[in-house]
Structure formats: structure tokens, C-alpha cells
Regions:
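Catalytic phosphate/metal-binding cores of nucleic-acid and nucleotide-processing enzymes, i.e., regions
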Residues: 1-154
């Protein structure tokens, strides 16, 4: 049977070995942040939007490039008044590492200039390492359904 010409291509379900998306990484990370009882928020800047929604968000003050995670609880290490994380997909699973945009680079630099620790995390494990190095007390036991963002393409 031929596929209907009126339907778009079917999306294939992601296999367990496929690369986690930035959204997958963020969903896993937020559980650690909540468990640590930190004052934090996620920004809703990612994703594609229609022109009308994008224009409305811009009019409301949404800025391009703001990091994905903003932690207002000062890092216990004493480095920075807060911590900003830009989450990117790690390299692996046949996919290239996520790229930092020019707007994102500017935000990271500006946050550092006002005393924030601002980092790019390539995957969940990298994000947890950054948070741990900042002195945050995280429960590092894997959560149920934890994503695996370590994969070697060799």
C-alpha cells in the first residue's frame, strides 16, 4: 500500500540509543535542581514559534540568547552571584555537538561581567559536573528514567 500523498512523512520514534535533545537534557536536569531546593528558573526561549507568537513574546521582553537555566542561589564555591547554564546536546550518537549562537555568547559574557558564573553544558553529565564544581549539593544518584548522554562514535 502506498502512503497517502496528503500526509507528511511519519516521524520515527527515537530509539533509546539516539542522541538526547536539549529538551530531554533540561527535563532530566530540573529534577536535580528541584531536589537540591535551589532558587532557579528555566527560560522558555528555545523552540520554533510562528511569527505572531514570536512578535508577541518579543514585545513582552523575551530576549534572544538568554541561558536555559538561571540559578539565583549563589554558588557555595563563592564564585559568582548566581549560575547560568546554556544546555547543548553533546556530541555522539552520530550527531554533532550543539552550537552556541552569537546571542547566547553575548549573554554568557554579559552575565560574567556582572559577577555571574555562566557556562555551557554539553549534556546532562557535564551540567551536573558544572553544578557540583560550583559547590551545589546535588543528589547524584541517577533518577529513574535518566537519559544517557554519553556515547562514543568511535
Amino acid at each position: 500500500m502506498k502512503p497517502s500523498p496528503y500526509r507528511g512523512p511519519r516521524s520515527q520514534p527515537r530509539s533509546k540509543s539516539s542522541a538526547p535533545s536539549e529538551a530531554d537534557i533540561q527535563k532530566a536536569l530540573v529534577r536535580y535542581l528541584d531536589d537540591a531546593h535551589l532558587l532557579w528558573t528555566a527560560t522558555a526561549n528555545g523552540g520554533k514559534r510562528d511569527k505572531r507568537t514570536a512578535a508577541s513574546l518579543k514585545a513582552q521582553g523575551v530576549k534572544a540568547g538568554v541561558p536555559d537555566i538561571l540559578i539565583f542561589t549563589p554558588p557555595p564555591s563563592g564564585i559568582g552571584t548566581g549560575l547560568a547554564l546554556e544546555l547543548k546536546r553533546p556530541q555522539g550518537f552520530g550527531k554533532a555537538r550543539g552550537r552556541v549562537s552569537a546571542h547566547q555568547r553575548v549573554w554568557l559574557e554579559e552575565l560574567r561581567a556582572i559577577g555571574w558564573r555562566a557556562e555551557v553544558a554539553y549534556g546532562l553529565q557535564h551540567a551536573l559536573e558544572i553544578l557540583s564544581s560550583a559547590g551545589y549539593d546535588l543528589e547524584l544518584e541517577p533518577h529513574t528514567g535518566e537519559i544517557n548522554d554519553h556515547h562514543n562514535d568511535d
